[in-house]
Amino acid sequence: MAKKDYYDVLGVERGADEKEIKRAYKKLAMKYHPDRTQGNKELEEKFKEIQEAYEVLSDKQKRANYDQYGHAAFEQGGFGGGGFSGADFGDIFGDMFGDIFGGGRARQRVVRGDDLRYDLEISLEEAVRGTTKDIQINTLAHCDSCDGSGAEKGSKVETCSTCHGAGRVRRQQGFFVTEQVCPSCHGSGKKIEKPCKSCHGDGRVHKKKNLSVKIPAGVDTGNQLRLSGEGAAGENGAPNGDLYVVIHVRDHHIFERDGSNLYCEVPISFTMAALGGEIEVPTLDGRVKLKIPAETQTGKLFRMRGKGVTSARSAYAGDLICKIIVETPVKLNEEQKALLRQLEESLEGSSNKPKSSSFFDGVKKFFDNLGK
């Protein structure tokens, strides 16, 4: 099968300079590296093709031969002779993996402690007004017995001779460079003569920790509070992680919350709905009087401004929205039933019951039209 043009393989123009060729190669090599393609044979062949193209175009003499004779310059007995000798890919892969593996020099591994999560349930009143809650977490803490060194007091702690304190070692196979945890010190970068009996050489121990968490006013379900440095202890003296407290507000028996607004259902008698009156409704600040106008229907909303929640991100309080539910009387005695029948007979159609009259007139028209 005919070979592709090396310039096309790297995606560069024929007049590209050395920097452009190197940049193009690095980008493609990173994309098609076998560590990323996970055994895909087609992509492995693509990677070999990219390497072959770079080896030729990065070498001035080979590039000149290729520009003059094409692929024939490197065929057995061809004009250029010599085949492929293996270009110096070390600096290329050193650059590529430098950011991932900490640059070209070995450095001791510093691993920040894990972040932790704590789910905290609070009442609506606590969420609205703010509160302080005591919590207990399970965490990895600095070992007091060895002061975090991992070694028994008086025991020697030496730098690991395999990784020279880096905690990781590099392996080079041809022009491939890989990095892995040091097998001698298991990533700690040190050799301990006598490990601490409390932490078994880790420098950290599992323990329960008590904390007081200040909950600001206006929080809601899903809000997170970050307690900096209250997570797990880091390795080898690295910083602690953070603790994230996730708020969950319990359902309330009266109010429902939607952002800064509160909602509640207010039942009233059908006589009050018809005649009007005044009732007391609950708010988080106490009882407030609400005037019910005559002829109020079920579902009517009354907005009480400023009686909602002041959220953690706003200086303004939301509203309390009361939904009226007209309650039908139940368990009536015979006398009460007779009074209601008498009332029903006294009510005129459209003037006293406009919605009922309108509805049934509409139903009649519907069936009349259906029969035509």
UniProtKB/Swiss-Prot annotation:
Cofactor(s) listed: Zn(2+)
A biological process from GO: chaperone cofactor-dependent protein refolding
Keyword Metal-binding set for record: yes
Secretion signal, residue range per the UniProt entry: none
Domain J residues, every copy: 5-70
Cofactor note: Binds 2 Zn(2+) ions per monomer.
CR-type zinc-finger residues: 130-208
Major location category of this protein: cytoplasm
Subcellular location: Cytoplasm
A single GO molecular function term of this UniProt record: zinc ion binding
Cited Pfam families: DnaJ, DnaJ_C, DnaJ_CXXCXGXG
Start and stop residues of the CXXCXGXG motif repeats: 143-150, 160-167, 182-189, 196-203
Binding site for Zn(2+) 1: C143, C146, C196, C199
InterPro entries: DnaJ (IPR012724), DnaJ_C (IPR002939), DnaJ_domain (IPR001623), DnaJ_domain_CS (IPR018253), HSP40/DnaJ_pept-bd (IPR008971), HSP_DnaJ_Cys-rich_dom (IPR001305), HSP_DnaJ_Cys-rich_dom_sf (IPR036410), J_dom_sf (IPR036869)
Subunit structure: Homodimer.
NCBIfam families listed in its UniProt record: DnaJ_bact (TIGR02349), PRK10767.1 (NF008035)
Domains (record comment): The J domain is necessary and sufficient to stimulate DnaK ATPase activity. Zinc center 1 plays an important role in the autonomous, DnaK-independent chaperone activity of DnaJ. Zinc center 2 is essential for interaction with DnaK and for DnaJ activity.
Biological role: Participates actively in the response to hyperosmotic and heat shock by preventing the aggregation of stress-denatured proteins and by disaggregating proteins, also in an autonomous, DnaK-independent fashion. Unfolded proteins bind initially to DnaJ; upon interaction with the DnaJ-bound protein, DnaK hydrolyzes its bound ATP, resulting in the formation of a stable complex. GrpE releases ADP from DnaK; ATP binding to DnaK triggers the release of the substrate protein, thus completing the reaction cycle.
PANTHER family: CHAPERONE PROTEIN DNAJ, DNAJ HOMOLOG 1, MITOCHONDRIAL-RELATED
The name this protein goes by in its record: Chaperone protein DnaJ
Organism from which the protein derives: Pasteurella multocida (strain Pm70)
